A protein has these predicted regions:
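Terminal amphipathic alpha-helical/low-complexity segments used for targeting or macromolecular assembly
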Residues: 1-126, 251, 256-310
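Structural signal for interior beta-strand "rungs" in well-ordered beta-sheet cores
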Residues: 130-251
Length: 310
């Protein structure tokens, strides 16, 4: 997409640069990450006066107290915190950084594109396994952890994209993920939903995953390929292919790449098992089943009696 250069007024640019540099330096230091996140959020939400009043022991309302406590990610839980197989060491830091990302997106500053893109790029450099240069991360992006995500150079991830890195996500150079796209790297057993299987999901260089499309766990979207709007990818999209529908099927090769692309029939190959990520849960880990379902199938006699009674 052809863009024009836009810049902030010099005074605004100076303020943005100073703030991002300060947060970056603090996150790169030996300072406690949880404390840094809390401190930054207190100021971003303009709550410094109320926070200092509370910290000094002066009375505050119950609503004010719970709001001020919420700036500290140690006082909050997020969904992925409950996942049994997560890497506890990696998650401890990524939770704090993910909290800062999410809460930043709830501030008015998140709509200042020049400021917000640079702030999120800086956060990604601390949160992701690896992130390239000149990426553009827009508002409302969500992750499972963040620390299992690799993103290449000049990649654009638009509003409300979900990046499930419960397994592993690799997103290449110059990739475009359109609004509301979903990339998954985990799946559930069809009978026992609590049994989780993790995979490596790949979106290769120059690929485009368009509006509201879904790439399921263990799939690969090939180089220079396009996934159509609302498509569901349940296998591999070969390089240079255009895939649409549910499940997504290759319907065309991008003009100009016909001589180097695989035939359309090659699309949809399921190589999920090659990308499985094995894990083991600690034997002493206390777990629970949130559904409490009974997985015992009915006996033949029970099924027969039900049929006869209808």
């Amino acid at each position: 997409m052809t863009k024009r250069h836009v810049s902030l007024p010099p005074e605004a640019e100076e303020g943005v640069d100073a703030f991002i540099t300060e947060v970056d330096q603090r996150l790169s230091s030996d300072e406690d990450v949880c404390g840094v996140v809390q401190d930054v959020l207190v100021d971003l939400f303009g709550d410094r006066e109320a926070y200092e009043r509370w910290q000094s022991g002066k009375p505050v309302s119950a609503a004010t107290r719970v709001r001020l406590q919420g700036y500290d990610p140690c006082n909050a839980t997020i969904e992925s915190e409950y996942y049994a197989e997560k890497d506890e060491t990696a998650f401890k830091k990524s939770k704090y950084l993910q909290w800062l990302w999410r809460q930043f997106d709830a501030t008015p500053m998140a709509d200042n594109v020049e400021f917000a893109l640079r702030f999120r790029q800086m956060l990604a450099e601390h949160l992701f396994e690896r992130v390239g240069d000149n990426c553009r991360f827009f508002k409302g992006i969500s992750f499972t952890y963040g620390h299992n995500i690799t993103v290449g150079d000049n990649t654009v991830i638009h509003d409300d994209v979900h990046l499930d890195d419960r397994g592993k996500l690799t997103i290449g150079d110059r990739v475009s993920l359109s609004d509301s796209a979903h990339l998954y790297s985990h799946d559930h057993d069809i009978v026992d939903q609590t049994a989780v299987e993790n995979y490596h999901t790949i979106v290769d260089d120059d690929a485009r995953v368009t509006y509201d499309a879904m790439v399921t766990a263990g799939s690969r979207v090939g180089k220079n390929s396009v996934v159509g709007a609302k498509a569901i990818v349940r296998g591999d999209v070969p390089d240079h292919h255009i895939a649409v529908g549910s499940p997504a099927k290759s319907v065309k090769v991008k003009p100009g790449w016909e001589d180097v692309a695989e035939p359309l029939e090659a699309g949809g190959e399921n190589r999920k098992e090659e990308r499985r990520i094995e894990y083991e849960l600690p034997a002493d880990l206390e777990v629970f089943d949130e559904f409490g379902r009974d997985f015992t199938p009915p006996s033949p006699s029970t099924s027969s009696s039900r049929t006869n009674s209808q």
